[in-house]
Amino acid sequence: MKRYILTTLFALVLFAGSAFATGHIPQNDGKSEVETYIKKVAKIKSDEIDYAYISSSMFRQMFNMLGADVQSELNDIPLQLTSIRSMRQFTATGPEGYKQLSQAMDIFLQEEESVMGMKLMALNREDGTMTAIYGDSNSTLVINDEGDELNVVFIAGLSYESFKALGESGMEIGF
């Protein structure tokens, strides 16, 4: 059963930018160009909130177009890029350079108090599913384990307190 997490306008992200419709991913030769592209095709701007969403297949396709030197740079900043769906499948088939986020998942599954420098703010277990929310004053990371599917949403520029306030105001997203 799909569960909903209260937060910002996630559903609109799926329709943000022509790249989602065309599947076109431009050639990039630098980290800043990759980040610019992601922001162009997958950003919702609401006040000061930047929300980036990239599917695992799109990220893998884009990652594979980059040179080894750029892949190495991106290895240091995976969470700045993205939100990933079906993480288990992606970590099994994804590029070596995305290992850090896989390690974050391992930490999560052991229920550590922090992931990637963000503190565990909320943990909910219900009927074999688990949702954990990590955050700090700059970002929020939501990990939703449905048992057969693991969803990860990273929201850059949205503090945990703002995330919580949006939820309390009734905005919702569905994974």
Predicted regions and their residues:
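Hydrophobic, Leu/Ile/Phe/Ala-enriched alpha-helical segments that form helix-helix packing faces
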Residues: 41, 108-112, 170
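Short Gly/Thr-rich strand-loop-strand
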Residues: 102-135
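Surface-exposed amphipathic alpha-helical segments
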Residues: 157-175
